[in-house]
Amino acid sequence: MKQIWKQTWRQRLAAALIQLLMVLAMAGVGIRMPVQAAEKNAVTQSGEMKVHFLDVGQGLSILAQSEGKTMIYDGGDRKTSRFVVSYLKEHGVSKIDYLISSHYDADHMAGLIGCLNAFDVKNVISSNYVHTSKLYQSFVKAVKADGLKMQHPAVGKTYKFGSGSFEILAPKTIEAKGSNNNSVAIKLMNGENSFVFTGDAEHESEAAMCNSSIDLSCDVLVPGHHGSATATSWDFLQKTVPEYAVISCGTNNKYGHPDKDTMDKLQSMDIQVYRTDKQGTIVVTSDGANLNWSAEPCNDYTPGDDSDQGTQSTSEVQQEASQTATGEHVWVSATGNKYHKTNHCGNMNPNTAKEETREEAEAQGLEPCKKCY
């Protein structure tokens, strides 16, 4: 009997131990899962990043701040150099981790010389060409005086910046004449939010960016060359598909910036517009998922020159000529599976669109664009 009782007791003890181990194993999984979830959240969540679009009149200057790191992209003209330096100091800047000169035109570069003299600068990124101006020589001298070298990174190079990063988009090549298409363009990223700055890059540089394998999509685009007609092509807008555009230009500037053609494109694509000539300095804060602006968009799509009537594209002329044709005519893009009422729908490039009858479009299996119909 004792032997049977011992055997039964051992069996019960073994069963109890097995049950205990199972409970502990399950408890261990329960403990580990929240830790793993926390680790995953730490990866997907981003810290705060502030982007300031400074009102430097007819010029460009953008300040970015994140987790103690600072970037200045262009510094505006001579007459606003003191303002830029003062603004940075007022916002707690003592050092600049990345000073980026998109190109060497005075309305972009002059204020950077003041920044080099006033702050501890860690890195200078600029375009790999030489300008003939005395201002350029002053810039080079200021860089050397700080014991720095001008870095000319290749397209695709990525830098860590605070809670995010930025990637070089342009220039792919350097033009011997002119400087606008030599502009250093970047995509600044923080979690799911992103910004594209292109300096004075024009259509040729934009085309090179579009033909690269880099994802150009962004939440915020600063239209190139202050909203000039020489930049912000349809193809570039369709690649960037921004929700917001921030135009940096001077009030009643002599160039007529922003151009009517550019503003018409932004309006046709329902892109929300901010303008420094109308609203002054604009600040946006990113938490990696959402954008919090210092002001509402002005959505003022009027050109800088009231007499600017824009240009009429060939496709628009064709549209007018076909108005007398029988049957409903629609517009079809070179790619895509929709047809459109107008070639300026905003969801297609009007310069590559072709016109045909609705019956022909539907026979190809195309469906009506939800924005047009």
Listing of model-derived features with the role each one plays in the protein:
Residues 2-9, 28-322, 346, 370-371:
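Non-globular, low-confidence helical/coil segments that flank catalytic cores
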Residues 10-26:
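Sec-dependent N-terminal signal peptides
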Residues 270, 280, 352-358:
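Low-complexity, intrinsically disordered Gly/Pro/Thr-rich segments
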Residues 313-337:
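SH3-family beta-barrel domains
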Residues 335-353:
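Beta-loop motif signature
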Residues 356-368:
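A short, charged, amphipathic alpha-helix used as a generic interaction element across diverse proteins
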